[in-house]
Amino acid sequence: MRKIFIGCLLLVALAANAHSAQQPSTGVPSKLVKVRDDFFMIENINATVADIGSYGGNIAVYLTDEGVVLVDSKNERTHDDVVAKVRSLTDKPIKYVVLTHNHGDHAGGAPKMQAIGATILISVNDRENMARAPNVAWVPQFGYVGRAQLVMGGKEVRLYEVRGHTRGDTAAYFPAARVVAMGDLLTTSEDIPLIVNYPDGGSWMDWSKSVDEILQLDFDVAIPGHGPMVTKQQVVNIRNKMVAIRERVRTMNREKKTQQEITDTLIKEFNWGMGPSAGNVPAMMQELR
């Protein structure tokens, strides 16, 4: 039996080895990585900023006797690759796609998933972010607020709405598998820095609070938005680094340091503050004043 228990749900109408089975070749640089017997990750091999728009982020794949739950959908271009990889694991239908947030490299493939019968879930806050984007053509039918629960084939998925990368990030927790999928609350690729999206309501102050909340969950493996999966201790290490960066900015703000001085210090001390993260520096300075 499939169930959705969404106490706060609003109906908004309108390190493991690559999977050993033969993986379909579709021209998309991705691979299946086995996490558990019933849990896999579709990892973008080219985890670089230049390839985000073309190939999207990671996807979590949870297998049940009644169907498949995905976390994130990459983008429209990668749809056939995602479906082929799921089909290499099971002939059960993709029943649910949980979107960790509204950005196209994670949510862009959702319309095609809906077209093949999947129900799409996202937080109401990030649904609203999606709806106000220029020239928006589609938004998910269902949104939730705060907490939600999916049960399908006797397996549970718990959804936690938190603020960090955006104002309505979703962390998807799989208790039986001891896995949490965090979207862009967590990135582990050396080429894609962890950043906050301020235009979509993100916050570095709330990011650490949200990660601390997630760390209270009983998990062994975290699936990031980009990059390889990591252990819980590695999440702690990343959290501590980003808090150290934040507090360094706070201190230098008080010392009346310039943006360039702060940026130079962050690059030197943390190897952070260049490339995509450079745009976070002035916004972080403003948030921490």
What are these model-derived regions, one by one?
Residues M1-I4:
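Positively charged n-region of N-terminal signal peptides that target proteins for export
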Residues K34-K85, A172-Y173, R178-G183:
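Conserved beta-strand hairpin/beta-sheet module of binuclear metal-dependent hydrolase folds
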Residues D80, A84-M152:
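Active-site HxH/HxHxD metal-binding segment of metal-dependent hydrolases
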Residues G7-A15:
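Bacterial N-terminal signal peptides
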Residues Q22-V35, G67-V69, N75-R77, I116, V124-G168, P175-A176, ...:
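Metallo-beta-lactamase
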Residues A15, H19-P24, L215-D218, M229-R289:
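Accessory terminal helices/loops
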Residues D38, Y62, D72, V86, ...:
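Divalent metal-coordination and catalytic microenvironments
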